[in-house]
């Protein structure tokens, strides 16, 4: 089956949704060779993936993940990664802020692959447990309002593609579909995308898969986050409609900042800067970029009617130390201690 589908791709043809499902299922069930996986990923990268293909791939990935029953009122803040900007873990900081405001967050993430610091790396440095069972994850969500879903634990079938992905080295379709396969089956998300040219395709894919409100964001300085230093391109899926717009820091009540203020070299620096944001001892740009991204998430969650209102609410949570108190709660509940 996979040989036939590879031949079809080699002829420049695209796969149907069902063919894409079968191709990804073959990969994730361990029935494809490393050469076949590398060939598929390479051809898709050169040609570009269609919405049918993305939908089939995500369906196959979701069908093989270990899911948790988190209810309908859960949001995720996750990115494709690979933006090369070496920023601290902004989406992780935003997740802590919005969870301090009563919005449940199922943060889906991994260790660093191409970045300086993955969300798992920085949470460990902060003393927050990342490797929990589905039952423990659900309990953390109910008691703390935030749980971290460590991708390798919930997507064990991904191990079959790990070798080829590492060997070829470039971004693949897995960077795009990973954020679309949250084990909590979130219908509301903010997804950072390393290139805005993928955003409409991803939005249409999520529409087909039943998402309610998702914003795909790309800073014009290359961030897979909303940028504090320049404009951010946004593609929004809301109630079945898709629209594109641009947001600037100024229009949501924030001054423009410096990208250098949010860049780090390693997980230790990232954790230190995240904590400094929570204690309001970080550079203003760092505090504001977290407020901006948290504000977008509050809007996606339906907590506010506008992004600007969300930013105001998020910044108040930081300045009032509500976000820092939430960080301390997460440490108290899930701190990792050596035996």
Curated annotation (Swiss-Prot):
Gene name as annotated: trpD
Quaternary context: Homodimer.
Residues binding Mg(2+) 2, per UniProt: 224-225
Reactions catalysed: N-(5-phospho-beta-D-ribosyl)anthranilate + diphosphate = 5-phospho-alpha-D-ribose 1-diphosphate + anthranilate
Residues reported to bind anthranilate 1: 79, 110
Name of this chain's protein: Anthranilate phosphoribosyltransferase
Keyword Amino-acid biosynthesis: yes
GO MF: anthranilate phosphoribosyltransferase activity; magnesium ion binding
HAMAP family: TrpD
Biological process according to GO: L-tryptophan biosynthetic process
